[in-house]
């Protein structure tokens, strides 16, 4: 039967496809002999384990030979590994652009590892000893009148601890291993890899540190003692004394595996290891984060083995050749049967397109191929809790179209592969490209739980964990409390004041323009003093007060003269300020007025404003008479409240509160400036005693204009050096950006406690601090005590709902209805 034109055309296409398939097959075969020789040997998986001698002791099960002091571990005759601990960054809260940048940086990080390096990422959520946590937040009694407040505050902290899951410690590690003939060769290469790994983490903005041998043993000990009760006791000097090996110091009391091959027992705890079967066509960066967000003891391990790029390309070409052969067979059938040869099984067409795209990714898009094993280890004190935890983890996997499969009869291999040693005994691997592997982003959100003199700042809104931080550890401990009226600014600052008072020996000074802090300071009894500054008050502050530590240099008069110039400028400067002649006269008289005090520094010789006034009258220049006349109302007139020697014993009280509400308009700005100088005097005196001074300024926007604004900028620049920690409270964010000089206050504040913000202020802050839209949602129509904490490079959303049924709450609150209820 003669062929029609369509059949002839199909046969020509078929012959062309056959020739193309042969060419692809030839490309795939190139280097086949070589790759067969260089193919790595099989790992010791389940069946290999059956053939080998079964371990008789726990020590024999732990798969390493020797741990060295520098952190290098020898697993076999030729395999050496090292471990680096890394810490979290705010990935989930970051802006979309920042997320993309972190993801791309992490892809580059993975691409660094070639086929000769095995990588293991270990994420450990482990139950810690609750007694240790409680001890770290405990405020011990001191046998004084404040123990009642200490107990109430301590009980509040313990109650907040119960709300969160601070019983879980979260740690992240990367272990990398290489093959080497001897330790010396391994050491050189591992140290080079370690340097590159740390540099790559630094590029990502991630803090990381290498573990030494002792720290690696402590890590293994914690993994093999999941209850956290047994402490790790080991020194290198113990080895020759006892004749034991390092394994003896980290091994649990017992290790057994169930007959059904599904669980194991380590010490008093039950556990099970599962592997993640990746079925989803597309993965999301939330999968790993959600697994680690489970409030359970879980360890997730990613074993990553890079494939040589040329080998990966050959493998794909070989697969494409196989697919083409299958396609040709289908096309032959179609031609023989007389139907269209383009009608082939859907799967063949799909697989062919996927293989083509994968080849293109490897050849032109900076992608590599990795073999990835994802292991999930659950551990619990009771079997029922273990099964519940596994069910919860399986639910997370199913949510993202994956499956969590138990490692039946491979629990021992799974457990050992979950230790941060860098060995994978499970031969269940999934091939993934760089971007598919990087979707398991190892970053979620930061936690902030410092020890020592750490203060309480609420609960992490994402994890419900306690936020405990020590501002003294910051490069710039200066702080700002920002929020709309009623958002909880004053309450938060007062809570911090109480915490500082109870936990430290530091001094606290409060600038209180609205007279809100008096009841709190009175709770501190003899250690607190409320100082009312007003025209009718009998509390006096001498603006001429000075101490010999007032300045860095040997002559404190230079800096004091600068303050008095600012004071006079405020009084008589007008719009144009003091003239050069007036400034010269004031500076001259300042130096003269302190001459007697410097010769004999006793309180009786401390000058007052009237002494400066008298000196000005004696000067010959007419400008001096003008200055004296302007000062007269503050010396002999109705505003002479600041023309007295100080009668406040500031150094006798730890907490001072300057109430400024009654000053009136005429004295308000002058009073604020004089108060700032009095605070500076206290800070400089405290520095010589090695004592920190905390300075809180409510309604901070009042001190951001004119001379007080300049003085505030100086405080923010210089206080840290003198042991001072200033904090400003304001709802007027725009005032903080009124000038480039005032804007420095923002840049010199590493602590920002941001509560609910008005619409205009939100946009300003987002631009100034680089806040993502998701982060901004935490300060948009948020409730009292809810917002964002900026602590150095860490940004954490917080919630602080202080218990209302306490004495402390009644003195901390500033809500009118609650204050009225307290008074009633």
Regions found by a protein language model. Give the residues of each.
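Extended, folded cores of ATP/NTP-driven motor/assembly subunits in large transport
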Residues: 2-443
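P-loop NTPase motor domains
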Residues: 89-90, 96-115, 126, 290-292, ...
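Hydrophobic anchor at the beta1->P-loop junction of P-loop NTPases
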Residues: 481
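Conserved lysine of the Walker
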Residues: 489
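Hydrophobic positions on the alpha1 helix immediately C-terminal to the Walker A/P-loop
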Residues: 492
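Post-Walker A helix-loop "phosphate-sensing" segment adjacent to the P-loop in P-loop NTPases
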Residues: 499-509, 528
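A short helix-turn-beta junction within AAA+ P-loop NTPase domains corresponding to the substrate/partner-engaging
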Residues: 525-531, 741-754
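Conserved P-loop NTPase
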Residues: 769-823
């Amino acid at each position: 039967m003669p062929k029609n034109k369509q059949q002839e055309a199909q046969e020509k296409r078929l012959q062309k496809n056959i020739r193309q398939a042969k060419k692809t097959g030839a490309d795939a075969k190139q280097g086949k002999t070589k790759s067969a020789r260089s193919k790595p040997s099989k790992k010791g998986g389940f069946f290999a384990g059956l053939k080998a001698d079964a371990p008789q002791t726990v020590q024999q099960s732990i798969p390493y030979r020797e741990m060295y002091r520098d952190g290098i571990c020898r697993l076999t005759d030729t395999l050496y590994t090292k471990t680096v601990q890394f810490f979290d960054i705010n990935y989930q809260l970051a802006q979309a652009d920042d997320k993309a940048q972190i993801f791309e940086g992490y892809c580059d990080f993975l691409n660094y590892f070639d086929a000769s390096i095995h990588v293991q990422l270990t994420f450990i959520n482990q139950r810690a000893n609750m007694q240790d946590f409680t001890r770290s937040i405990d405020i011990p009694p001191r046998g004084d009148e404040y123990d009642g407040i200490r107990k109430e505050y301590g009980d509040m902290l313990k109650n907040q601890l119960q709300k969160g899951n601070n019983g879980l410690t979260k740690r992240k590690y990367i272990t990398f291993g290489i093959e080497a003939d001897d330790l010396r060769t391994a050491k050189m290469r591992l140290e080079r890899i370690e340097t590159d790994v740390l540099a790559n983490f630094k590029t990502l903005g991630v803090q990381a540190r290498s573990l030494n041998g002792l720290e690696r043993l402590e890590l293994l000990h914690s993994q093999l003692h999941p209850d956290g009760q047994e402490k790790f006791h080991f020194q290198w000097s113990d080895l020759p004394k006892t004749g034991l090996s390092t394994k003896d110091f980290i091994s649990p009391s017992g290790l057994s595996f169930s007959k059904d091959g599904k669980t194991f027992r380590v010490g008093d705890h039950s556990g099970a290891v599962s592997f993640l079967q990746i079925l989803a066509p597309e993965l999301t960066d939330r999968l790993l984060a959600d697994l680690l967000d489970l409030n359970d003891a879980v360890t997730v391990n990613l074993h990553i083995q890079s494939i040589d790029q040329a080998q990966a390309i050959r493998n794909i070409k070989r697969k494409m050749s196989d697919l083409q052969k299958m396609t040709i067979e289908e096309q032959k059938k179609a031609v023989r049967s007389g139907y269209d040869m383009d009608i082939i099984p859907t799967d063949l067409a799909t697989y062919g397109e996927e293989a083509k795209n994968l080849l293109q990714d490897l050849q032109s898009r900076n992608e590599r191929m990795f073999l990835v094993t994802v292991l999930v280890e659950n551990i619990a004190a009771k079997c029922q809790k273990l099964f519940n935890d596994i069910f919860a983890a399986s639910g997370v996997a199913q949510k993202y179209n994956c499956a969590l499969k138990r490692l039946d009869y491979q629990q021992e291999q799974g457990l050992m592969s979950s230790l941060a040693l860098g060995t994978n005994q499970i031969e269940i691997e999934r091939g993934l490209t760089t971007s598919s592997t990087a979707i398991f982003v190892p970053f979620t959100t930061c936690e902030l739980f410092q020890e020592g003199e750490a203060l309480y700042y609420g609960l992490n809104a994402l994890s419900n964990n306690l936020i405990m931080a020590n501002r003294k550890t910051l490069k710039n401990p200066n702080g700002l409390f920002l929020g709309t009226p009623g958002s909880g600014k004053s309450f938060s600052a007062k809570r911090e004041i109480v915490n500082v008072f109870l936990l430290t020996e530091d001094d606290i000074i409060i600038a209180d323009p609205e007279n809100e802090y008096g009841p709190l300071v009175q709770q501190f009894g003899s250690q607190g003093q409320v100082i009312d500054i007003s025209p009718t008050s009998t509390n006096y502050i001498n603006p001429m007060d000075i101490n010999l530590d007032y300045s860095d240099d040997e002559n404190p008069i230079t800096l004091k003269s600068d303050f008095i110039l600012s004071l006079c400028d405020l009084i008589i400067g007008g719009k144009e300020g003091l003239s050069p002649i007036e400034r010269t006269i004031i500076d001259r008289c300042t130096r003269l007025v302190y001459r007697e005090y410097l010769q004999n520094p006793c309180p009786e010789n401390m000058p007052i404003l009237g002494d400066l006034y008298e000196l000005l009258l004696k000067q010959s220049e007419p400008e001096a008479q003008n200055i004296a006349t302007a000062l007269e109302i503050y010396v002999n007139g109705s505003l002479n409240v600041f023309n007295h020697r100080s009668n406040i014993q500031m150094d006798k009280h730890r907490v001072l509160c300057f109430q400024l509400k009654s000053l009136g308009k005429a004295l308000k700005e002058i009073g604020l400036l004089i108060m700032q100088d009095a605070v500076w005097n206290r800070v400089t005196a405290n520095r010589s005693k090695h004592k920190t001074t905390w300075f809180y300024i409510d309604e901070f926007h009042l001190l951001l204009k004119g001379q007080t604004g300049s003085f505030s900028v100086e405080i923010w620049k210089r206080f840290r050096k003198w042991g001072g920690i200033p904090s400003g409270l304001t709802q007027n964010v725009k005032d903080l950006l009124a000038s480039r000089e005032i804007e420095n206050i923002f840049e010199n504040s590493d602590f920002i406690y941001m509560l609910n913000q008005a619409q205009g202020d939100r946009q300003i802050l987002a631009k100034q601090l680089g806040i993502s839209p998701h982060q901004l949602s935490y300060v948009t129509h948020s409730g009292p005590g809810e917002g964002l904490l900026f602590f150095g490079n860490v940004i954490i959303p917080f919630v602080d709902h202080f218990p209302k049924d306490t004495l402390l709450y009644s003195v901390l609150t500033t809500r009118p209805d609650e204050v009225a209820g307290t008074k009633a």
